[in-house]
């Protein structure tokens, strides 16, 4: 680098408490590449957050909400082109293409580095580079890992403060030579001298790139959510799943909850659902009337890191410190705990603004306000919505809220040792075929259930099945390596635990979404899902019966506690039945998935499929 070029770079301003020479060198290298106007090391303080939020209010990026309605809360509206994760621009750049597998986008690492070098060269001109240190998981936990994100977005800095343990304390844990995942993010919109900024800078060209071997993340062009908050899906799932593969643990797209029985016995459950299946609602479940004395507590709503503990049991932490939840559909009816969490200290993105300075989204109330400003800054009324179909909030509008504000938060949620998992639950959105609840006969069959799970992508008409999108383990967009190898990894983790004499968690498959002949959902869902949870826990403690069926073990009508709910045996039959013709079709679809993943597919899963086919043939005979 020439002296003239060096002279144009800003001072690094490294705080005296940052002692990590390798990290400082890395920051210096990124500064030299991206050429920001300033470098700011985030300390995670309230004063810093207030300053950055005020800066964004002045820039038009955010607006402060009515403090009487939502204390210390803000609303951001993104560019209409930058509203969601971009799966087609998300790359796993492993050294070998087969390590990414057929379900990921792969690019040769050397070529991708070349491309990104060109894009990031001068990408932060005129902007501030924020150094954002964060811990995924409680600081110092043996299950936690540290990352550092370099971003030119103050929106990223303030959201990461809520979503992770972010700030000065991270440097104490990192010390002079600790391991960290390097993350680089730019909105990709450099500013020339004197050029006015826009409220939501972004670039039509987008890349979200992961290098599994070097544990690096580079993101360009988007300021939104999972594309820019690199601790979330990029680190906590794509990179962490690869770390787990190499080190013998699991990084999963799962909620974690605690369930305490009326007698005071506590269980912990981790559950994986694809999007639009009510994951956050289940994580914050309130037991229904008739189930007095049961208590459900929330440890996490989206991601679980699970490592074998010293006792041999699988122990899980929520690596996040906040909720980045979908707002539309969240209401006092569907999720009162989430609504209580959102009362203060929240950043809302792409929801509507009310005339009194509060927020609204579809599904929040039965009757919408008479007038709103929608997520694109336009006037909105119920009449306009009826005439044009225009939504007040974007369907993927989000809230970023501290987990500590959740009324149902579990007292163990920050236990650095994690909580011991008693059961795994996997579920999708299926209008037919899959029963309300099934217990796997063993670990291998449970892995088979999770590997073949899916959701309908279209609302099924009466008597018609929607198109099923397979989403193994709800990890299809988030697994950082070959999906067949991921199945092998789950089998290997179970085998290691069994060999060590540990008690394996039971595995269950659920489906809240079976429809009746009238095309309506039969199962009431929401809090009533507690009845299914109670049956599972009864199975764990040896108190609940069950009957063998083709796919595993399911409850009979008398095995479920119906206190306080009118649900007939006929209705129960509609949600629990296993129809042979539908299952023949289902198994054929499983076969299609296995063909796609044929290279490296565990033989144990092919045997599990053959076993189900054999049982199905026996039923028909």
From Swiss-Prot:
<dbReference type="GO" id="GO:0046327">
    <property type="term" value="P:glycerol biosynthetic process from pyruvate"/>
</dbReference>
<feature type="binding site">
    <location>
        <position position="233"/>
    </location>
    <ligand>
        <name>Mn(2+)</name>
    </ligand>
</feature>
<dbReference type="GO" id="GO:0005525">
    <property type="term" value="F:GTP binding"/>
</dbReference>
<dbReference type="InterPro" id="IPR008209">
    <property type="entry name" value="PEP_carboxykinase_GTP"/>
</dbReference>
<keyword id="KW-0547">Nucleotide-binding</keyword>
<dbReference type="GO" id="GO:0006094">
    <property type="term" value="P:gluconeogenesis"/>
</dbReference>
<feature type="binding site">
    <location>
        <begin position="224"/>
        <end position="226"/>
    </location>
    <ligand>
        <name>substrate</name>
    </ligand>
</feature>
<dbReference type="InterPro" id="IPR018091">
    <property type="entry name" value="PEP_carboxykin_GTP_CS"/>
</dbReference>
<feature type="binding site">
    <location>
        <position position="275"/>
    </location>
    <ligand>
        <name>substrate</name>
    </ligand>
</feature>
<keyword id="KW-0963">Cytoplasm</keyword>
<feature type="binding site">
    <location>
        <position position="398"/>
    </location>
    <ligand>
        <name>GTP</name>
    </ligand>
</feature>
<keyword id="KW-0342">GTP-binding</keyword>
<feature type="binding site">
    <location>
        <position position="302"/>
    </location>
    <ligand>
        <name>Mn(2+)</name>
    </ligand>
</feature>
<feature type="binding site">
    <location>
        <begin position="526"/>
        <end position="529"/>
    </location>
    <ligand>
        <name>GTP</name>
    </ligand>
</feature>
<feature type="binding site">
    <location>
        <position position="253"/>
    </location>
    <ligand>
        <name>Mn(2+)</name>
    </ligand>
</feature>
<keyword id="KW-0479">Metal-binding</keyword>
<dbReference type="GO" id="GO:0071333">
    <property type="term" value="P:cellular response to glucose stimulus"/>
</dbReference>
<feature type="binding site">
    <location>
        <position position="429"/>
    </location>
    <ligand>
        <name>GTP</name>
    </ligand>
</feature>
<keyword id="KW-0456">Lyase</keyword>
<comment type="function">
    <text>Catalyzes the conversion of oxaloacetate (OAA) to phosphoenolpyruvate (PEP), the rate-limiting step in the metabolic pathway that produces glucose from lactate and other precursors derived from the citric acid cycle.</text>
</comment>
<comment type="similarity">
    <text>Belongs to the phosphoenolpyruvate carboxykinase [GTP] family.</text>
</comment>
<dbReference type="InterPro" id="IPR008210">
    <property type="entry name" value="PEP_carboxykinase_N"/>
</dbReference>
<dbReference type="GO" id="GO:0005829">
    <property type="term" value="C:cytosol"/>
</dbReference>
<feature type="binding site">
    <location>
        <position position="85"/>
    </location>
    <ligand>
        <name>substrate</name>
    </ligand>
</feature>
<keyword id="KW-0210">Decarboxylase</keyword>
<feature type="binding site">
    <location>
        <begin position="276"/>
        <end position="281"/>
    </location>
    <ligand>
        <name>GTP</name>
    </ligand>
</feature>
<comment type="pathway">
    <text>Carbohydrate biosynthesis; gluconeogenesis.</text>
</comment>
<dbReference type="InterPro" id="IPR035077">
    <property type="entry name" value="PEP_carboxykinase_GTP_C"/>
</dbReference>
<dbReference type="GO" id="GO:0033993">
    <property type="term" value="P:response to lipid"/>
</dbReference>
<dbReference type="InterPro" id="IPR013035">
    <property type="entry name" value="PEP_carboxykinase_C"/>
</dbReference>
<dbReference type="GO" id="GO:0019543">
    <property type="term" value="P:propionate catabolic process"/>
</dbReference>
<dbReference type="GO" id="GO:0006107">
    <property type="term" value="P:oxaloacetate metabolic process"/>
</dbReference>
<feature type="binding site">
    <location>
        <begin position="396"/>
        <end position="398"/>
    </location>
    <ligand>
        <name>substrate</name>
    </ligand>
</feature>
<keyword id="KW-0312">Gluconeogenesis</keyword>
<dbReference type="GO" id="GO:0004613">
    <property type="term" value="F:phosphoenolpyruvate carboxykinase (GTP) activity"/>
</dbReference>
<dbReference type="Pfam" id="PF00821">
    <property type="entry name" value="PEPCK_GTP"/>
</dbReference>
<dbReference type="InterPro" id="IPR035078">
    <property type="entry name" value="PEP_carboxykinase_GTP_N"/>
</dbReference>
<protein>
    <recommendedName>
        <fullName>Phosphoenolpyruvate carboxykinase [GTP]</fullName>
        <ecNumber>4.1.1.32</ecNumber>
    </recommendedName>
</protein>
<comment type="subunit">
    <text>Monomer.</text>
</comment>
<dbReference type="Pfam" id="PF17297">
    <property type="entry name" value="PEPCK_N"/>
</dbReference>
<keyword id="KW-0464">Manganese</keyword>
<dbReference type="GO" id="GO:0030145">
    <property type="term" value="F:manganese ion binding"/>
</dbReference>
């Amino acid at each position: 680098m020439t002296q003239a070029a060096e002279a144009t770079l800003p001072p690094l301003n490294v705080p005296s408490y940052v002692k990590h020479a390798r990290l400082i060198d890395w920051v210096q290298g990124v500064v030299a590449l991206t050429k920001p106007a300033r470098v700011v090391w985030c300390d995670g303080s309230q004063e810093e957050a207030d300053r950055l939020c005020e800066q964004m209010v002045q820039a038009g990026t955010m607006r402060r909400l009515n403090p009487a309605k939502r204390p210390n809360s803000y609303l951001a509206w993104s560019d209409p082109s930058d509203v969601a994760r971009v799966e087609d621009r998300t790359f796993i750049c492993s050294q070998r293409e087969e390590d990414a597998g057929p379900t990921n986008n792969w690019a040769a690492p050397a070529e991708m580095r070349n491309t990104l070098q060109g894009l990031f060269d001068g990408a932060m001109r005129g902007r501030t580079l924020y150094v954002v240190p964060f811990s995924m998981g409680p600081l110092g936990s043996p299950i936690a890992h540290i990352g550092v994100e370099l971003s030119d977005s103050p929106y990223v800095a303030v959201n990461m403060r809520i979503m992770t343990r972010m700030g000065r304390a991270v440097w104490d844990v990192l010390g002079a030579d600790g391991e960290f995942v390097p993350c680089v993010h730019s909105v990709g919109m450099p500013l020339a001298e004197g050029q006015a900024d826009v409220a939501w800078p972004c670039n039509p060209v987008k890349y979200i790139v992961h290098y599994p071997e070097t544990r690096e993340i580079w993101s360009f062009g988007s300021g939104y959510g999972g594309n820019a908050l690199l601790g979330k899906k990029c680190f906590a799932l794509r990179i962490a799943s690869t770390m787990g593969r190499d080190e013998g643990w699991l990084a999963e797209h799962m909620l974690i909850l605690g369930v305490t029985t009326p007698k005071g016995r506590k269980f912990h459950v981790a559950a994986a659902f694809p999007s639009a299946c009510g994951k956050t609602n289940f994580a914050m479940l309130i037991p229904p009337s008739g189930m007095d004395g049961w208590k459900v507590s929330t440890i996490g709503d989206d991601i679980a890191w699970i490592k074998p503990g010293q006792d041999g049991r699988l122990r899980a932490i929520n690596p996040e410190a906040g909720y980045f939840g979908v707002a539309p559909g969240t209401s006092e009816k569907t999720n009162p705990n989430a609504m209580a969490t959102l009362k203060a200290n929240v950043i809302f993105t792409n929801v509507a603004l009310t005339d009194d300075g509060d927020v609204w989204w579809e599904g929040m109330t039965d009757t919408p306000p008479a007038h709103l400003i929608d997520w694109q800054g336009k006037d909105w009324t119920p009449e306009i919505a009826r005439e044009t179909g225009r939504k007040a909030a974007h369907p993927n509008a989000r809230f970023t809220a501290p987990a500590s504000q959740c009324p149902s938060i579990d007292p163990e949620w920050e236990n650095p040792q994690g909580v011991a998992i008693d059961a795994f639950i996997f579920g999708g959105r299926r209008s037919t075929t899959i029963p309300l609840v099934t217990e796997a006969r063993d670990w291998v069959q449970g892995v088979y259930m999770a590997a073949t799970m899916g959701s309908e992508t279209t609302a099924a008409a009466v008597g018609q099945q929607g198109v099923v999108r397979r989403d193994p383990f709800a990890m299809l967009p988030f697994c950082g390596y070959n999906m067949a190898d991921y199945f092998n990894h789950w089998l290997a983790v179970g085998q290691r635990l069994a060999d060590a004499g540990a008690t394996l968690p039971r595995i269950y498959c659920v489906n809240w979404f079976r429809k009746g002949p009238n095309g309506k959902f039969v199962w009431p869902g929401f809090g009533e899902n507690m009845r299914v949870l109670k049956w599972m826990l009864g199975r764990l403690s040896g108190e609940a019966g069950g009957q063998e069926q083709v796919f595993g073990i399911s409850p009979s009508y008398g095995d479920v506690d119906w206190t306080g709910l009118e649900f007939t045996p006929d209705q129960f039959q509609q949600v629990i039945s296993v129809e042979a013709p539908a299952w023949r079709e289902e198994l054929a679809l499983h076969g299609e998935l296995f063909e796609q993943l044929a290279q490296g597919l565990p033989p144990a899963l092919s045997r599990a499929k053959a076993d189900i086919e054999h049982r199905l043939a026996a039923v028909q005979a």
